[in-house]
């Protein structure tokens, strides 16, 4: 019975570590994805502003 408890405890411990590592990796991936989306939003807002500014300066 003691051997069974040790085995189950070891399995539980390894599964907990595995889940923790997966969660950290998932969070890191979400942060990278959020940065990419944020950069795309900045480009969308910035490029029309520059275009309008150039049109105003060139008088077209």
From Swiss-Prot:
**Residue numbers covered by the propeptide annotation in the UniProt entry:** 23-43
User: In the UniProt record, does the keyword Secreted occur?
Assistant: yes
Q: Name one GO biological process term.
A: killing of cells of another organism
Subcellular location(s): the record lists:
Secreted
Gene Ontology terms, cellular component aspect?
Answer: extracellular region
Concerning InterPro entries, the annotation shows: Frog_antimicrobial_propeptide
- Is Signal a UniProt keyword of this protein? yes
Tissue expression from the record: Expressed by the skin glands.
The region annotated as signal peptide is 1-22
Family to which this protein belongs: Belongs to the frog skin active peptide (FSAP) family. Temporin subfamily.
Protein purpose: Antimicrobial peptide active against a variety of Gram-positive and some Gram-negative bacterial strains. Has antifungal activity against a slime mold isolate. Has weak hemolytic activity against human erythrocytes.
Q: What is this protein called?
A: Temporin-CG1
């Amino acid at each position: 019975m003691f051997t069974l408890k040790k085995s189950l405890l070891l399995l539980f411990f390894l599964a907990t570590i595995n889940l923790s590592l997966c969660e950290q990796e998932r969070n890191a991936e979400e942060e990278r994805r959020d940065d990419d989306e944020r950069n795309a939003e900045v480009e969308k807002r910035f490029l029309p502003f520059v275009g309008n500014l150039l049109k105003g300066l060139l008088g077209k």
